[in-house]
C-alpha cells in the first residue's frame, strides 16, 4: 500500500481489494480501516487537521476495485440499503455477478452461484477469516443479518493465497459494523406480506470515552410464522423460521498494536413440509421437515506494525466454531456436530518502493460427527459417520507495483492434509493500466476443496430418491480469467464498462447425478470432463446528479459428465440480463430503486415416463423475469422504506415433483430453478441515535 500525504489531504492507493486492515493516518498512529475503504484506485479524503485517529471513506454505490490486481468489487452500506437486505443471501439482488438460488423447494436452503458454479466453490470469509464451512453452508446465507454488515467484498476467479487454497471461483468477504466507529445505537424493524418479521438492534461503546478501546453488541430476531401454500401443492412455500442471533465484538489499540475480537451465538428452528388438512394416500402421516441449529463462534486478530522504512507488519489471526444441527426429513435423519478451528500467522514487508513480500503459516482443522438414516424406516438405527481433517500450510506472495500502472502478484502455497496428502497451490494476477481509459487484468491459478457432501448438501435428503454416495476425493480445479475495464469520458460524465471472461476446468469434482437413474441420486467423483465458461459485460453511468444506472449481461456455458454423458449442468440459467436504476433527487431525502432481471432458460435433469405415457416433467425451462422496487424516505435519525420483490409474479410450476405422495421414491423437492412464491411486499424502519 502506498501513502502520499499533503497538508490537509490523505491519498490512499490500494494494491488489492482484500488487504490487511492496517494503515497509517497522517498523525502516524495506526488506524483500523475497513478494506472496502481502499477499494478504489486512488481515493482522496480531506482531513480536518493533523491529529487524525481514523480515516473514513464512504461511497453510496458499488465500487469496483481499480487499484489491485485481483478482479473484485465492494458493496457498501448504501448499496445494501437499496433493497430490504434482510440477510447476506438477499444482498446480491442488484449484483450482476452473483446469483442466489433455492437449493430445494422445501427447506428454504439457498446457495450462491458465481461464474456459473455452486456456492461450495466460493470461499466465504468473515472479516477475512474463513467461515460457514461444512454443515453451516446450506443455510449460511441466512446467518448474517443485513443490518450487521458494513460492506461486502466480492472477488472473482482466483483469490490471494493468503486466505487459503479453497477459492476456486472467488471469495465473498463480509465486513461487520465496527466497535471503533462513532458511538451510536441502531435499530431495524421489518415485516412482509409473507408473514415474516425481523428486529435488529446494534450498539457500540467507547470504554470510558477511550478512543483506544471499544465494544459492540449486535442482536437479531426473526420469525416467519405463515403457512403459505400459494400453488396449492399441499406444501409450504416458505419454511417457518425462528432465529435468535447475537454477537459481541471488541477492538483495542495501544501504539502500534491493534486487537479485534468477537464471540457469537445463533439458535434457529426451521419447520416446513405439508400443511394441515392435506390427506396422503393409504392414511400416511403428513410429511414434515424439522431442522434445529445451534451455532457458536469466536474470532481474534492481533496485529503489530513495526516502525521501520519497510512498513513491516505481523498479524496472528484465528477463529473457532461449533455447529450443532438436528434435522429430520420425514423419517430420514441427519444430525451433525461440527467443530472447526483456523489460525494464520502473516508477516508483510516492503522491499523498496515497488516490491512487497507477504509470507505466512496457517492451520485448519475440521471435525464432523454425523448420525445418519437415509431411508424412511423408523425401525432402522442411525449410522455414525466421522470426518476429520487437519491441514497445516505455508505461503509466500510477491507483489510488484509500478506506480499503480502495472501490478503483478504471484503466490504459492504448500499444504499437507492428513487425508489427501501434500498439494501445491500456485496463483498469479496481473493488472496493467494501459492509459486513463483502459485497464487490463489477467489471472490464473489452482484451487482445492475437501468435500463433506452430506454436511454441505443434506437438503438432498428432501428427495424420495435413493441416495448413493461413493468414495470421494479432493476436488481440484484450474481457473483462468481476463477482464478489461473502460472509463470513457462523455462530456462531464464517465461511462464505466467492464468486460470479463473466466474459464474453470476441473481435474476432479464431486458430481451429484440426477440424470442416470430417475429413482437414484448418485454422488461420486468426476469420471470425464467438467468445465465452466462465463462471459460478462456490464456498464454503469450517472447521467444526471442522483441517478445511477447499471446494465449487465452474463452468459454461462457449464458442462459436466453425468453417467458417462457430457451434459449441461442442470438448474443453471444459460444467461442473465440485469438493469438497475437508483434515483436520489435533491437533498437526498427520498430514494427510488428498481431492479429488473431476465434469467435465461436452462436444463432440468432427465425426466422419466409415467404410466400414462407422459413425461414426469419438462426437460428444459424457459427464461423468466423478476422485478424488485423500493422507496426510502430519510429523516434526521431514521428512515422508512417500503418495496416489493418478484413483482412480475413469476412462480416455478410444480417445484415439488410427486407432491401427492411424499413418502414415495418419485417425490423430489430439489429440482428448483426459479422463484417458488409469487409477488411479496414489505415495509420497515431503520433508526440510529
Write out the residue ranges for each language-model feature.
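C-terminal beta-signal and adjacent terminal beta-strands/loops
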Residues: 26, 549, 598-607, 631-689
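Flexible loop and strand-edge segments within Gram-negative outer membrane beta-barrel domains
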Residues: 27-28, 35, 224-245, 253-314, ...
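N-terminal periplasmic "start-of-domain" segments of outer-membrane beta-barrel proteins
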Residues: 36-40, 50-83, 111, 152
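Extracytoplasmic beta-strand/coil segments of soluble accessory domains associated
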Residues: 89-130
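Short acidic/polar hinge/loop motifs at secondary-structure boundaries
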Residues: 111, 129-156, 246
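Short strand-turn segments of transmembrane beta-barrel domains in outer membranes
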Residues: 158-161, 171, 176-206, 236-239
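Membrane-embedded beta-barrel scaffold of Gram-negative outer-membrane proteins
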Residues: 313-327, 433, 441, 473-531
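Gram-negative outer-membrane beta-barrel transporters
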Residues: 401-403, 497, 501-505, 525-607, ...
Amino acid at each position: 500500500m502506498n501513502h502520499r500525504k499533503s497538508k490537509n489531504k490523505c491519498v490512499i492507493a490500494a494494491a488489492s481489494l482484500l488487504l490487511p486492515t492496517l494503515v497509517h493516518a497522517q498523525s502516524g498512529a495506526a488506524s483500523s480501516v475497513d478494506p472496502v475503504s481502499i477499494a478504489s484506485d486512488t481515493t482522496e479524503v480531506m482531513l480536518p487537521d493533523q491529529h487524525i485517529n481514523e480515516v473514513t471513506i464512504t461511497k453510496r454505490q458499488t465500487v469496483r476495485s481499480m487499484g489491485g490486481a485481483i478482479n473484485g468489487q465492494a458493496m457498501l452500506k448504501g448499496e445494501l440499503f437499496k433493497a430490504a437486505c434482510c440477510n447476506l443471501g438477499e444482498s446480491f439482488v442488484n449484483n450482476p455477478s452473483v446469483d442466489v438460488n433455492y437449493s430445494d423447494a422445501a427447506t428454504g436452503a439457498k446457495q450462491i452461484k458465481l461464474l456459473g458454479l455452486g456456492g461450495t466453490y466460493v470461499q466465504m470469509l468473515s472479516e477475512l477469516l474463513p467461515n460457514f464451512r461444512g454443515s453451516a453452508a446450506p443455510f449460511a446465507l441466512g446467518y448474517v443479518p443485513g443490518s450487521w454488515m458494513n460492506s461486502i467484498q466480492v472477488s472473482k476467479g482466483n483469490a490471494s493465497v493468503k486466505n487459503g487454497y479453497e477459492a476456486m471461483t472467488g471469495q465473498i468477504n463480509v465486513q461487520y459494523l465496527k466497535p471503533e466507529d462513532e458511538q451510536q445505537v441502531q435499530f431495524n424493524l421489518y415485516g412482509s406480506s409473507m408473514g415474516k418479521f425481523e428486529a435488529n438492534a446494534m450498539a457500540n461503546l467507547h470504554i470510558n470515552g477511550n478512543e483506544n478501546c471499544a465494544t459492540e453488541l449486535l442482536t437479531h430476531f426473526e420469525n416467519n410464522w405463515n403457512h403459505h401454500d400459494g400453488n396449492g401443492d399441499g406444501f409450504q412455500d416458505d419454511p417457518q423460521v425462528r432465529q435468535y442471533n447475537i454477537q459481541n465484538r471488541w477492538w483495542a489499540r495501544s501504539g502500534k498494536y491493534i486487537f479485534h475480537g468477537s464471540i457469537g451465538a445463533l439458535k434457529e428452528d426451521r419447520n416446513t413440509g405439508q400443511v394441515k388438512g392435506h390427506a396422503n394416500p393409504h392414511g400416511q402421516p403428513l410429511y414434515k421437515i424439522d431442522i434445529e441449529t445451534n451455532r457458536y463462534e469466536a474470532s481474534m486478530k492481533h496485529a503489530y506494525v513495526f516502525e521501520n522504512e519497510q512498513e513491516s507488519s505481523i498479524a496472528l489471526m484465528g477463529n473457532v466454531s461449533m455447529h450443532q444441527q438436528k434435522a429430520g426429513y420425514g423419517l430420514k435423519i441427519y444430525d451433525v456436530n461440527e467443530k472447526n478451528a483456523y489460525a494464520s500467522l502473516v508477516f508483510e514487508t516492503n522491499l523498496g518502493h515497488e516490491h512487497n513480500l507477504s509470507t505466512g503459516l496457517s492451520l485448519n482443522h475440521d471435525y464432523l460427527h454425523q448420525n445418519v438414516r437415509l431411508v424412511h424406516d423408523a425401525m432402522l438405527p442411525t449410522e455414525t459417520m466421522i470426518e476429520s481433517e487437519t491441514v497445516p500450510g505455508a505461503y509466500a506472495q510477491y507483489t510488484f507495483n509500478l506506480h499503480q500502472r502495472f501490478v503483478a502478484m504471484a503466490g504459492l502455497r504448500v499444504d499437507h492434509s492428513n487425508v489427501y496428502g501434500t498439494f501445491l497451490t500456485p496463483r498469479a494476477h496481473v493488472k496493467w493500466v494501459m492509459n486513463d481509459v483502459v485497464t487490463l487484468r489477467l489471472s490464473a491459478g489452482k484451487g482445492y476443496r475437501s468435500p463433506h457432501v452430506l454436511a454441505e448438501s443434506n437438503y438432498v435428503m428432501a428427495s424420495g430418491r435413493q441416495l448413493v454416495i461413493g468414495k470421494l476425493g479432493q476436488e481440484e480445479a484450474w481457473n483462468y480469467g481476463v477482464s478489461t475495464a473502460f472509463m470513457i469520458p462523455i462530456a462531464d460524465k464517465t461511462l464505466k464498462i467492464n468486460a470479463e471472461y473466466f474459464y474453470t476446468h476441473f481435474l476432479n469434482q464431486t458430481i451429484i447425478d440426477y440424470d442416470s437413474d430417475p429413482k437414484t441420486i448418485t454422488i461420486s467423483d468426476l469420471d470425464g470432463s467438467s468445465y465452466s465458461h462465463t462471459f460478462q459485460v456490464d456498464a454503469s453511468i450517472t447521467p444526471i446528479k442522483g441517478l445511477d444506472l447499471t446494465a449487465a449481461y452474463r452468459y454461462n456455458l457449464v458442462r459436466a459428465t453425468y453417467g458417462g454423458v457430457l451434459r449441461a449442468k442442470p438448474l443453471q440459467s444459460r444467461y442473465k440480463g440485469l438493469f438497475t436504476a437508483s434515483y436520489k433527487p435533491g437533498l437526498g431525502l427520498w430514494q427510488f430503486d428498481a431492479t429488473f432481471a431476465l434469467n435465461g432458460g436452462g436444463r432440468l435433469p432427465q425426466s422419466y415416463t409415467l404410466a400414462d405415457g407422459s413425461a414426469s416433467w419438462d426437460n428444459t425451462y424457459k427464461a423468466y423475469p423478476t422485478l424488485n422496487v423500493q422507496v426510502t424516505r430519510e429523516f434526521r435519525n431514521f428512515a422508512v422504506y417500503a418495496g416489493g420483490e418478484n413483482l412480475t409474479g413469476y412462480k416455478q410450476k410444480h417445484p415439488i415433483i410427486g407432491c401427492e405422495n411424499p413418502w414415495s421414491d418419485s417425490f423430489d423437492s430439489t429440482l428448483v430453478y426459479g422463484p417458488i412464491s409469487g409477488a411479496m411486499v414489505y415495509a420497515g424502519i431503520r433508526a440510529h441515535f
